From Swiss-Prot:
Compartments it resides in: Cytoplasm
Residue numbers of N-acetylserine PTMs: 2
Top-level lineage group: Eukaryota
Stated name of the protein: T-complex protein 1 subunit zeta
Amino acid sequence: MSLQLLNPKAESLRRDAALKVNVTSAEGLQSVLETNLGPKGTLKMLVDGAGNIKLTKDGKVLLTEMQIQSPTAVLIARAAAAQDEITGDGTTTVVCLVGELLRQAHRFIQEGVHPRIITDGFEIARKESMKFLDEFKISKTNLSNDREFLLQVARSSLLTKVDADLTEVLTPIVTDAVLSVYDAQADNLDLHMVEIMQMQHLSPKDTTFIKGLVLDHGGRHPDMPTRVKNAYVLILNVSLEYEKTEVNSGFFYSSADQRDKLAASERKFVDAKLKKIIDLKNEVCGMDPDKGFVIINQKGIDPMSLDVFAKHNILALRRAKRRNMERLQLVTGGEAQNSVEDLSPQILGFSGLVYQETIGEEKFTYVTENTDPKSCTILIKGSTHYALAQTKDAVRDGLRAVANVLKDKNIIPGAGAFYIALSRYLRSANMNKLGAKGKTKTGIEAFAEALLVIPKTLVKNSGFDPLDVLAMVEDELDDAQDSDETRYVGVDLNIGDSCDPTIEGIWDSYRVLRNAITGATGIASNLLLCDELLRAGRSTLKETPQ
């Protein structure tokens, strides 16, 4: 009881009790999330303290927004949420694998096997899994020209987040968005150049893809044009309003004339800037009524300046978001200016159509019909906040799924095919050659059995019997082994049978599986080797003297 001598208020759990807490917590978290897994998974309703509702089946959203008390469950939740940050998917998979690895290991520990021996087996199995993954993957080249295949990848990801009807709407939107910002020559892809804009209007099925930019504000003057064709776009980061001096100073006047002169001199600074902008507009547009001029400024524009722009038929937007300034340059081809001293036609962008749309009290400005834009917008629509949030989460995961394939140049057949094939491989492999001797084999056995939790859960969530469906899959794999042919066999969740995911167009991300297996094995091993739980941290509250 050395801990009690050091800290009388400390609480501890030793060996069996600590392991039981860890296993129970992991299984509890698994039982909450496993019903979400796959395209047939169920939704969870999250209600916060203010009564706001969120419907989701996204594991990352659940783990980050649920209130979790158990320290073990918090550890697993944080690690699984980190998986989503890195790869964009696989959160529920990690939680299910950790829970099942601990459950299978606990069975052997109760029979007298030491946790260290099991974790050694886990590590051998993990290394073999990575080798098997590299053999199982299908390499793809020239993906930017294979839109049909990328549509299948996006559909596979989106089906696990939203219903089938909405998936068919979002699949081409997500694929086209990634392709529009992907630079195949430099193999460069920046998903930050895809703007996701929410509009509380219509339904999620009215979500659209804009090959351009949508700004969530409009012109601030009633006389400004709301639709500009063949628009020259000036991107500015210049204050077009009167600013106070940097040093504290005062100006005093003794008559109305002096006040008018003072006001006029204050305006001179801004008027000089306006004159240079209007001169540039006259130079590029002249008297041609088919040409327009648009100013998008990151800083403010005062009412008098707006009035001047309106008189010259210029659409001016003020206080644009900083993140949109870079996107505007990629969309229109213009260059952002920090001053009006060196304005020339070469720094202007061009857009075929800039128009304004008003929904309720909100204004949106569309910058469209551009030549080869390198930034785009996905306009998410929905009648409620939770519908918008659910669609936005699905779109983000879909974007990451397509981006992962373009970056990896590899893909894994889905529908649980990889987990079933890897489990068979580990069970049939010569464990002595793998370096597993004696009781270490129990770790590999536990690992192989735990892998089947993913296909079993997929089938169970579809309403079929997991044992029956997996038996059919095993039979088909046995037939393929007898005839020495390579066959990918997964589970068909629509009819409860086996299927070939490469024919059905069901795919998993290479990097998601790689990170999920590595992450789950690491978490499970650490929790198995934890033989004592201490609640002995310093209190943040100062203790009152006795």
